[in-house]
């Protein structure tokens, strides 16, 4: 910055900017520093398995449940006993918790940066829209609601609204 500054008796009375150069455009960002603890519900950037169990249906093309026709499966199905706790794959904000047609009882969590996870066919839900959840927090219980042929957790990972193969994100 080049400026013409006028002083009267040692006190600045006028300043006129003659020219300025921006060396680098400012970037809006959140910086974590100091000793303040990070909220537990903030996403960690990695996902965990929502339940332990055997994968009974993979991502992509498959025969429709009931054996008639075919569908493009938007997630994976993980078998589990009725009532088994379902856990959040990462921290975030619950954006849906309720009945959603073929999904049955569904929980949807927004993890930020374009990532959303869905957990379907639950027997019961333990979170509500607007809740902040942490990675590993119980959010539902395994069931067979909606278009389902047995107890399992349907797990989806979506990036910018597009379903992705969850196995590419799980350890």
What are the roles of these predicted feature ranges?
Residues 1-60, 81-82:
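Well-ordered beta-sheet/strand-loop patches within structured domains
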Residues 41-171:
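Catalytic cores of peptidoglycan-degrading enzymes
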């Amino acid at each position: 910055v080049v400026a013409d500054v006028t002083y009267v008796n040692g006190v600045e009375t006028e300043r006129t900017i003659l020219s300025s150069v921006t060396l680098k455009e400012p970037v809006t960002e959140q910086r974590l520093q100091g000793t303040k603890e990070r909220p537990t519900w903030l996403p960690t950037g990695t996902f965990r398995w929502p339940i332990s169990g055997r994968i009974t249906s993979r991502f992509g093309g498959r025969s429709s449940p009931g054996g008639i026709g075919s569908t493009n499966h938007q997630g994976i199905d993980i078998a589990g006993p009725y009532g088994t706790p379902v856990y959040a794959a990462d921290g975030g904000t619950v954006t849906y918790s309720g009945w959603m047609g073929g999904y049955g009882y569904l929980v949807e969590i927004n993890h930020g940066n374009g990532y959303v996870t869905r957990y379907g066919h639950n027997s019961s839900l333990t979170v509500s829209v607007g809740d902040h959840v942490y990675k590993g927090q119980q959010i539902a219980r395994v069931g067979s609601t909606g278009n389902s042929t047995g107890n399992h957790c349907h797990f989806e990972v979506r990036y910018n609204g597009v379903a992705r193969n969850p196995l590419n994100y799980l350890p």
